[in-house]
């Protein structure tokens, strides 16, 4: 049985490899179904809230277990047939078995629950999730690992669930359709040229990843070859094939990553063909995007997101804005139309160079961009007499630095608009700031 001491789970109530039946009562943040036996949670991928399921326990930990779905005894009305033929093996998507409307509701409920855990946030208003009319083929960036199977055959696709084994695919339901065609033809090229393929276990071989970036509205595509070597073998043949085969490819780049790491890209890139960047558009603004630039992967949703951020900023043209973690200046540029002045700060110097160039392209004259740590640059601006009415925050998944939070409190702007790709860190930091 389960032993509980002062609210702490001391031992598991389930055993590995045994089969159990249970009711799914919730979702994890990854979309897995949650079954509980006497408060002990078992996470079951592909199970849906309110379903009764039979599952086999495949992993047991002190605080939780992992189950494999065997049989659905009572099926949820929200269960749908996944449209992708690779869904059951590919690790790229987790929720195609759940109706899109239910996915939106699940995301809202997860945010609601995060805020409920903070007692002083109980009255926070959480609006409905804003979805898409057609939630397919929206991704403007594909990061495609390349490998070999045990028979020595080239595999090019995405990783299997919870592994680094590659699922060989020729199309993806969520990436730009142009990427499907490029992916298939590049695989044939790799086979024809007999390119050396990287083996992550031995840290030997050449080609690690193919990365594709496409401007959603312009159609311009960049192809990036990530290698474990300083040189790209058969470079001229690769350039000749891709440039003649695809009219939309305006940039071919070589990125060098020699690290024993799961990090996909290295620090050094070379332009082999065409432009250094591609161009895309958000609303009336154009942006140049390099191989390493952070750029939102869902352009139609990004326009909705930035429009909502602009609404929440409540600008009348007299405000000074600080855009922290500004990247290549997308949000700051969007805000500049209704602000007195925008100050953008970003730790990546190349991104700031892109932001300055993008400001010139869009004839934005009321913006200043500076490279450095947000908390340090903002303190410098403060000493220079810059007092923002609005601060925009869009940090990476790990959230904001604690020093930045303290700096933000000291600034005491009238409004903070916090865009987050990780609600858990957002709630944590709002609590730290006592907003």
Residue spans for each PLM region:
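Short, conserved phosphate/pyrophosphate- and ester-handling motifs at nucleotide-, phospho-/glycolipid
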Residues: 50, 175, 298
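Extended interfacial segments that mediate partner engagement and assembly in macromolecular machines
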Residues: 70-82, 88-197, 217, 232
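Short, acidic/hydrophobic/Gly-rich beta-strand patch recurrent on exposed beta strands
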Residues: 33-38, 157-160, 224-226, 355
